[in-house]
From Swiss-Prot:
The active site is at 277 (proton donor/acceptor). CDD domains: M32_Taq. Residues 3-506 form the Peptidase M32 domain. Binds 1 zinc ion per subunit. Can also utilize cobalt ions, but contains bound zinc when purified after heterologous expression in E.coli. A motif (HEXXH) lies at residues 276-280. Its cofactor is Zn(2+); Co(2+). One of its GO terms (molecular function) is zinc ion binding. Zn(2+) binds at residues 276, 280, 306. Gene3D superfamilies: 1.10.1370.30. SUPFAM superfamilies: Metalloproteases ('zincins'), catalytic domain. This is Thermostable carboxypeptidase 1. It comes from Thermus aquaticus.
Amino acid sequence: MTPEAAYQNLLEFQRETAYLGSLGALAAWDQRTMIPRKGHGHRARQMAALARLLHERATDPRIGEWLEKVEGSSLVEDPLSDAAVNVRAWRRAYERARAIPERLAVELAQARSEGETAWEALRPRDDWQGFLPYLKRLFALAKEEAEILMAVGPDPLDPPYGELYDALLDGYEPGARARDLEPLFRELSSGLKGLLDRILGSGRRPDVGVLHRHYPKEAQRAFALELLQACGYDLEAGRLDPTAHPFEIAIGPGDVRITTRYYEDFFNAGIFGTLHEMGHALYEQGLPEAHWGTPRGEAASLGVHESQSRTWENLVGRSLGFWERFFPRAKEVFSSLADVRLEDFHFAVNAVEPSLIRVEADEVTYNLHILVRLELELALFRGELFLEDLPEAWREKYRAYLGVAPRDYKDGVMQDVHWSGGMFGYFPTYTLGNLYAAQFFAKAQEELGPLEPLFARGEFTPFLDWTRRKIHAEGSRFRPRALVERVTGSPPGAQAFLRYLEAKYGALYGF
């Protein structure tokens, strides 16, 4: 068999696998949005059966045979060619999948499905003790998986693993390591705490009461749809639905869905939650369709994905220019804003206040929420913390970093869906996304000129096109670190983000 024939076999086989994965994504969307209460048990078994089938395909020995034919051939001489990018990723996925026993793959799928279902039921009841057995099972399985992946090792192009946590982190942010994250987070938290002290000491406080007036759910949805369309989200290739925990999910080309949640007494959750998920969806809609079903057509990492969502939620969506364009329309849609001035509204949606809930945190304190989760996850995987002690450790870290502490579990250790789905190692990608976003945005302004005047005129296409060319079109051709450096000229770091916050919040809070 020639290398060309082997590569064609790989393309066809992996695309077929991607179609099956796409069905899994559709089932996952349904589970989080529309499924009847009594359907969860059957759905968990469906997901386990699909996981078994996907694992069988991922470990098919023909993959190894085809890869051997292609590796070392002229097809992959250029390490940045489409074929080389695909083959390298397929080899890594094949070795990782072969190392995971089918029994573990199926158990993980079922435990994740059951864990999310339990979390949805038990969190509103504040039932930590009821949730703990699910979390223990998920953690044990994740640790078993990490031990196996640790033995397999990383991609040869990436740094070696230093500890168990790295093996899971690497699945979300290729090349990221705990030993690099810890000093980066220390630098960031030092800058954030200094900025937070100046904000709280400024004496200025926005009237956030305007955000807690009455905002009917249907009006929020209608307004959110207008924003989506104006910013460039293709509503003929997606949809917006309500859910308990907002998410974006790509079913496939032409089907990238957004969910959000609305509170009639809080403006931010529904509107900025929608803009956040829209950022994710714009990335998915901008990936090269010709490469769908291959690594070349996938996002570079969750951190890069998060850079797109945080950009549209915050750097665009919370800018004064954005609301110069949309606040007059918001006043038409929401009568409760009739007496509110643009400047006061803009200050309110950028209010800084230490709080308990990560997804509702402001730009200044958000990454301190992530620091808490990173330190707790590291302690768990290093054997320095037991799950039974997690709630108290959570409270202690919130007191230390944010000066607040939860009185219950639902707004404390149970607030996020991630651990209920076994997603250990995911949280750091949120902060990395914020850092990447600031660097990308600064570079875009350097090349396109000031962006806020464009936003004020409702012109979002120049910026969206820039991100499509520089980031989306590249798929996973580059590792996250290399992509950031290629686009911005600098490696990922904290300083661009801290400069952005300093300029914005210095102006708002008068220092």
